[in-house]
Amino acid sequence: MQYIQPAFHFPYFGLESFSAPSIPIIYTTFIMLIISSIGVILGYRFRIMSVLMFLSFTYIELWDVSFYLNHYYAVSLFALILCFLPANGIASLDAKYQRVQEQSSVPYWTHFIVYVQIGIIYVYAGIAKINADWLFSALPLKIWLPAHASLPVIGPLLAYDFTAYVFSWFGMFYDLFIILFLINPSTRYYAFATVVTFHSLTGLLFQIGVFPIVMIFMATLFFDSSIHQNIMKRFFSHGHESSEKNLYALGKPGIIMIGSFIIFQLIFPFRYALYPGNHQWTEQGYRFGWRVMLTEKSGNAQFIITDRITGKTGFVNNSEWLSAHQEKQMSFQPDMILAFAHFLHDEYQKQGVNDPIVTVDCWVTMNGRPSARFIDQTVDLSKVHDSFSHKSWIAEHPGEIK
């Protein structure tokens, strides 16, 4: 219902045509996602199904910016990688019915690309945590953890500031180094136990969907191949002879594709450095950067509509157009504020307001700081066009953010 009920959906800049479609297409896309996901699980027409799964899942994520999560971005990337892997080479319907040659082994690049992607997610999340709020003020965990103090056994500990500091520092070191311990055979199983504990705990404390489960199962890919082979032998019988021949050797085009993909993944998260100001405040270059659960922000955005000819002014009830979730997310994200301002301009113009002037009185609090003005209230947002350049109409935070 989150894609059906709201009167307005926030598009990604440059991808406005992918904003939430008509209801029949919404249902059709979800049905396609379900069917293709089942096909991938069973290994049925794997190549087609994996592509359909990637396209449908990613298409759904592009419907509305307000539902963006790093975790969904990660799932899209893993789904994209899966499209190119020979994951149906064994224990699949494709192999059973000889649509593909069963493979007893695969080349290292099929593991390497997954390892790199997992490593980037973890390490970049760790780098993002190297900031004063996270390490020296234990924020936002100092705000979030006490809310779970009623939990049995561990609950009372969560009420202490000391626990927030322990979680903050451990979280940083975990993200920075867990990939190294997973790669090292001598520490792999201890690391896996840590992964299970860490993600189980975060899944319990925070509403982050399937991400903990995804990362726990992803960690099993670091196990020695003999373990996976034993599992295959125990649960799946091979009806056909497996080939030792490498059918998936990586040629020059493949090397270029993988290299380009990795380079992009390494560089893209740092685009925030191209913008002035603190990116945690301005949100510029913030998405797609693995800054996972790094800030606690909330805001209030009161839009004001002024008739350009008569000067008559009115206030907007955001909930008339947006869901509670959309309004919450929009209140501290400037590109969403701008998109909604343009929507309001068009809607009120239809209602007879002459070329409406759209301004906003927006205040935001971040990591427990006092609320501060977020948007220049003198700017007519209906005349501002979005771009990848710096948004000069974002107000600077009056305090110091490190």
Predicted regions and their residues:
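Alpha-helical membrane-anchoring segments
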Residues: 1-402
